[in-house]
Amino acid sequence: MEVNKKQLADIFGASIRTIQNWQEQGMPVLRGGGKGNEVLYDSAAVIRWYAERDAEIENEKLRREVEELRQASETDLQPGTIEYERHRLTRAQADAQELKNARDSAEVVETAFCTFVLSRIAGEIASILDGIPLSVQRRFPELENRHVDFLKRDIIKAMNKAAALDELIPGLLSEYNRADRQYAGGSRS
């Protein structure tokens, strides 16, 4: 939606001066500006810019706090002290923010989502596989029933494997994590 400076200020509950400051900081302008021309903004683009800017500011604050705490060496911190607990909390917040950013940018996804998607795809594949014996029988009527039955048996095995995918994913994830930890642990070539 196209909005002018006043409308944008109303959307954000900010002053027109704040909008001008944001524009100087890189907020996207749709068109206008200059001598006597009203500046227009795409509200969706501005909201996206604002959210990204807000996340960057928050990340920078957390990074600074983590760096300050790292400077006060971790070994100097005593468990149970306020400094120690603050350090733990700040690190946890920084880790959580990094994970959230990775999730928002689709660098990581939830295991439940992967399970859902792969199970859905496996179901569609199973449906296609189910029709193959009949298609083969119609296309090649000269085939004996034993040939079609052989094909059906192997297809049923594949369909069962696909149907069990949602049950296999947690085990495969554990196997992947073990292999990844071994790789990260120093067995790199």
From Swiss-Prot:
Induction record: Regulated by the Fur protein.
Domain of life: Bacteria
Paired cysteines (S-S): none
InterPro entries, per the entry: DNA-bd_dom_put_sf (IPR009061), Phage_lambda_Nu1_terminase-ssu (IPR010906), WH-like_DNA-bd_sf (IPR036388)
Note: Encoded in the Qin prophage.
Family (UniProt): Belongs to the terminase small subunit family.
Protein name: Prophage DNA-packing protein NohA
Organism field: Escherichia coli (strain K12)
